[in-house]
């Protein structure tokens, strides 16, 4: 929880440092928005990872049922072509997630952090905090 100064406006940890211009605040806001989008991408990758694993295990039941129904050729094809298959050459989904996390995602987070440190003393969401101040409803219970 940040410390309020003057009762209205952003709390101290969301106030722009003295001398920080509007364009830089907007640029930091866009960089933060981009990172938030990449966070969503990461979540989708984890979803794909988990769903692919779930599908792979469901194939075991399909194979068993095809075998019981006398469709050995189809059961064997599923075993041969699908169960445990790399989703892209040389990679299971966990490897894709790890490479994303250790490469693109890690670098993206680091660049965003460095930009905040360099221009805003590490403060986050300055653009959004100021936007909140401009767009906040006039209701008395929304003054904080």
What do these predicted ranges mean?
Residues 2-68, 72-144:
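C-terminal-biased regions
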